[in-house]
Amino acid sequence: GLNMENWKKDSRKDIVMVDVDALVPPDHLLRKVERVMDYDWLYERLSPYYCADNGRPGTDPVVLIKMVLIQHLFGIASLRQTHREIQVNIAYRWFLGYSLLDEIPHFATVSYAFCKRFPPELSEEIFAHILNKALNNRMVDPSMIFIDGTHIKASANKKKLQKEQVAKAAKVYEEQLRKEVSEERKKLGKKVNDDDDDENKGSSGGGTVEKTVSKTDPDCGMFVKGAHERQFAYEAHTACDKHGFVLGVEVTAGNVSDSAAWDAVYDQVTNSFPEVKFVTMDAGYKTPWIAKKVLEHSRIPILPYTRYKGKKDKFKPWDFIYDAATDSFTCPRGHELRHTTTSKEGKRTYRSSPKICKDCPCRTVCGANESGQRILTTHIWQEYLDLVEHLRKTERGKELYAMRKETIERVFADAKEKHAMRYTHHRGLARVSAWVRLKYAAMNLKKIAIWKWNASNFASYIMIFAPFNDKTPVLVV
């Protein structure tokens, strides 16, 4: 029957003899992680930063790195909170190799080690080591990559700002575009711009532009989130494979466009994985330069449909037929638009004759200007965008673009919902970049650990039940 006295029994001060290992569930995530991680390389890498025969005894550097891994694996917002969680969590203590009574290293010790003692490139090395572990286990398929960017809210008050005049940033492809434009202008008999060799001028003509700068964290950028919402942020431009393994990341200020930061992350991934065949991106990357660069590298860019932004009741650009032999367009009424000039931004201009257009019955729907002239502009690298449009309509193109939601978008969703990447407490581009890389390293490590755990369990299942079923396939783990 019911015994109320048993319910009131207080066992909180009972003395129990038990080892920490027995208290951690056999399928706990940290057990899975511990099975796949190796730390010898970390001791070897960090040994020059510690003195063996002088000074006070230091904290084990691997313990400090494990504390940061715990923070990112379980989405704990800060190191201070991580320290509190480890104090009372038996599994966390087990992962660090500590008993129930051992004192946990102070969070300031961890922070100081990463800021002052450890080498700045340690986060990149940890990320690369974990990614190599996935490659060695043949878990990564770099033949197709997915690139996108996500914003991370900065630790900066959006009301504490100032306006600054900064030089326009030169584009990566500026020199190549300038050469091609100069050659084309010479063929057209046009003057080559005198400022082409001015190193102080950007691709849009040089000069400066006004920029909103945070007084708290000057490295972040003002990101326009919606019609009325603005905030300081960073952006993590990320590349992953079809399984969701992060292959590379480049962190920039939040006001840097996707296409401007694309070259850094693309070069980073393709240098590490030359076997990349398909590159899938969203509309923010649909530019002539990106299409040209990917296609010239014998890779296939997969980009989405973008809606035409002109007037609905006017002739569309595709209503005009291009003749490569004469380098001209023909309008729906059969009249010619001649190539007149090419701007230094790479825009070709085709113009019709005002004498013909003046009396044309289609003038109202043609889109001609007030002087009765129809002007059509295309980019000097338009042929690459046209090929991208063709690839988009193929079955393979539709299939790969649909995979974005379960690959790169899933990476961002998990990073923000499960691993606390929605906002950062760090300030400065270098510290935020290291923070993002460690977070992605933890996500890759989690995937490796779970996959290997599931594979070993499945192999055990096969070994037990194979004698009873001759048709059971053999799994090599």
Q: How should each PLM-predicted stretch be described?
A:
Residues 13-17:
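Short, contiguous pre-domain boundary segments
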Residues 92-96:
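Short amphipathic alpha-helical interface patches used for protein-protein assembly/oligomerization
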Residues 21-24:
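N-terminal, Lys/Arg-enriched amphipathic/low-complexity engagement segments
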Residues 19, 63-69, 109, 113, ...:
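A general alpha-helix detector
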Residues 7-10, 56-58, 98-100:
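A short, ordered amphipathic alpha-helix with a cationic face
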Residues 26-69, 74-75, 379:
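Basic, short loop/linker segments at the boundary and entry of helix-turn-helix/winged-helix-like folds
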Residues 1-3:
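Short, Lys/Arg-enriched N-terminal segments with co-localized hydrophobic residues
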Residues 6-7, 75-88, 100-477:
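Anion-binding and metal-coordination hotspots
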